[in-house]
Amino acid sequence: MAQQTPLYEQHTLCGARMVDFHGWMMPLHYGSQIDEHHAVRTDAGMFDVSHMTIVDLRGSRTREFLRYLLANDVAKLTKSGKALYSGMLNASGGVIDDLIVYYFSEDFFRLVVNSATREKDLSWITQHAEPFGIEITVRDDLSMIAVQGPNAQAKAATLFNDAQRQAVEGMKPFFGVQAGDLFIATTGYTGEAGYEIALPNEKAADFWRALVEAGVKPCGLGARDTLRLEAGMNLYGQEMDETISPLAANMGWTIAWEPADRDFIGREALEAQREHGTEKLVGLVMTEKGVLRNELPVRFTDAQGNQHEGIITSGTFSPTLGYSIALARVPEGIGETAIVQIRNREMPVKVTKPVFVRNGKAVA
């Protein structure tokens, strides 16, 4: 039996089409995925992300533990509330999960991890935390709502009290603050400004209803996927998994190589991969009729005349741009064009950076 978030009833009241998403009943859309997508790009939309797992870590050696556990370096986090994005790797350099970590104090950090990898993540974190004496608290008492879009912060702020409005005033991206019973973070998965707000389960439904009344459009998993793909953001299980290096998933920027003496899980394997080279993640654009879909082959000939093949990891029609886009994992040496096999047709595609839309505008 699939689990339900505390907002399940609100979704049905809003007319959602519900689907099983990694063991959770979640809204796919509320009538029109395209309208929901455009609402986030032009105004304000919201997503129930209560299926994601919030994990609080406490103990005097928490920073030391996370510097070992994660490929990115929490030594960078010195201001309370600051967050960073990181891969959590296995010994062979594969990605167990990608996550966000928040720093509150030397003995208190918070992780937000994916729902699909929950049990695996918790087992891995618990196993490696033991020698460091870390107290682990899974915050199943909290729901989470992502409010995203150019008007999202202003509309969400109409629900905040004076202290909460003051707490978020001027807050830069990738920060989080506990203000009363709300944890408000300037993070998201759409390429737009917004907040991800964690709050007690029993208060989630009222907050959702108030956001609807404030003019924030409920959005489902369908729009969440097209928005994140336009923004060039990875989806675990597609762009990366335990067999794929972060270097092959456009996550090289999340690996803190310095200081050279910091030992983190997967470092040795990554150093070997960096030396020998890996595949890379690129963007693909197809302006001709048709849709680039997951797992279609991508073929190209390199400058030496050698033929290579990669694979589309995520593909869709872009509602913002009006044509098809994709992320693809390909061998090094790809040029500015490639061929994608769609059924029995060879379709030309343009190779781009793996990001297509930022703040509602096409990335040239």
Swiss-Prot record:
**SUPFAM superfamilies noted in UniProt:** Aminomethyltransferase beta-barrel domain (SSF101790), Folate-binding domain (SSF103025)
Which EC number(s) are documented for this chain? 2.1.2.10
Question: What sections of the protein cross the membrane?
Answer: none
Q: Name one GO molecular function term.
A: transaminase activity
| Function description | The glycine cleavage system catalyzes the degradation of glycine.
Q: Which HAMAP family match?
A: GcvT
NCBIfam families in the cross-refs? gcvT, PRK00389.1
> Could you tell me what this protein is called?
Aminomethyltransferase
Which organism was this protein described from? Escherichia coli O17:K52:H18 (strain UMN026 / ExPEC)
**Phylogenetic lineage:** Bacteria, Pseudomonadati, Pseudomonadota, Gammaproteobacteria, Enterobacterales
The gene for this chain is: gcvT
